[in-house]
């Protein structure tokens, strides 16, 4: 399944200067537990925001046409959109950002996992998602955020 996962403010903010403007350990723990032992795909800017360090205990794939897979294969690089969709038919693949990648894959997503912070933060990049094509299946409530789980209506 193709799953998009992100965290946003109440008004859809997702970053400031290519960084998260918040640190909420409980939300990071949720992200880690959800994506652990799976393939994650991110854009080059998201990878750069992580100081080009792959995330532990996950297969890191960078969606880019200008990067190459390093010799040590600490991460992989692709720009094959169709291959990502084909692979997602066989296993869970998480798109973790950034916004351009979310925009590209949103229409093909089987599942959206959206953490919504219970506060506003200063952001310069915002998610604008039309949830009309998705069903809200479940919510997990935490002290500082709510996780909304959506499924694509076309999948039902």
Curated annotation (Swiss-Prot):
GO biological process terms on file: dihydrofolate metabolic process; folic acid metabolic process; one-carbon metabolic process; tetrahydrofolate biosynthetic process
Annotated GO MF terms: dihydrofolate reductase activity; NADP binding
Domain DHFR: 1-156
Entry GO CC: cytosol
The protein's annotated pathway: Cofactor biosynthesis; tetrahydrofolate biosynthesis; 5,6,7,8-tetrahydrofolate from 7,8-dihydrofolate: step 1/1
Name of the top EC class for this enzyme: oxidoreductase
Catalysed conversion reaction: (6S)-5,6,7,8-tetrahydrofolate + NADP(+) = 7,8-dihydrofolate + NADPH + H(+)
Cited InterPro entries: DHFR (IPR012259), DHFR-like_dom_sf (IPR024072), DHFR_dom (IPR001796)
Family annotation (Pfam families): DHFR_1
Its EC number(s): 1.5.1.3
Keywords for this protein: NADP, One-carbon metabolism, Oxidoreductase
Protein family per UniProt: Belongs to the dihydrofolate reductase family.
Record-given protein name: Dihydrofolate reductase
Source organism: Ureaplasma parvum serovar 3 (strain ATCC 700970)
Gene: folA
